[in-house]
């Protein structure tokens, strides 16, 4: 049986602090088995036993009930993570562009309207050095170039402009997550 990863948004940012051991315990208490995490940012690896949409709702409910805040869950297969890594349009574009730490895949709840992405790219063209590109499989690529902390392209702004929820992971994290997903059981 394969594995999926659930990217939980809003974990260990702002005031939403959760120890991964507590998250795993909450998921085990809710009936999930063979749960593991990668890094401290809400990357949960589970057996591929559930419908992704149903799994997302259940995970969001557990976080809300156990930890008292809303989190969006984006469930993806190993193939989708591999595609998000391989399809990175900014890879290898020089030392200031395409760095694995600076390029993020933003996993979206739905494929956004391409015209909304085009409008966002055009609007931001003169405001910063970041670059955006729409991928397939509900992924938006964002090269932060000079770092996330100095960017105006916050997750809230992206969600508002694109009309869907999303949570981001950098390429370094995605490679670690994929390696963990592909480990023998």
Q: Where do the model's predicted regions map?
A:
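Surface-exposed, charge/polar-rich loops and edge strands
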Residues: 2-41, 45-185
């Amino acid at each position: 049986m394969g594995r999926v990863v659930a990217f939980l948004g809003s974990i260990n940012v702002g005031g939403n602090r959760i120890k991964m051991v507590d998250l795993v315990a909450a998921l085990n208490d809710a009936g999930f088995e063979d749960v593991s995490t990668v890094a401290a940012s809400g990357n949960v690896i589970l057996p591929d036993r559930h419908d992704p949409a149903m799994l997302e709702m259940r995970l969001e409910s557990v976080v809300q009930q156990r930890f008292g805040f809303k989190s969006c869950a984006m469930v993806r297969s190993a193939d989708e993570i591999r595609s998000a890594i391989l399809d990175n349009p900014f890879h290898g574009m020089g030392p200031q562009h395409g760095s694995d730490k600076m390029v993020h895949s933003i996993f979206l709840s739905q494929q956004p309207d391409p015209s909304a992405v085009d409008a966002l790219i055009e609007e931001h063209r003169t405001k910063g050095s970041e670059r955006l590109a729409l991928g397939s499989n509900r992924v938006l690529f964002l090269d932060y170039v000079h770092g996330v902390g100095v960017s105006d392209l916050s997750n809230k702004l992206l969600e508002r402009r694109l009309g869907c929820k999303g949570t981001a992971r950098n390429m370094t994290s995605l490679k670690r997550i994929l390696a963990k997903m592909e480990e023998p059981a």
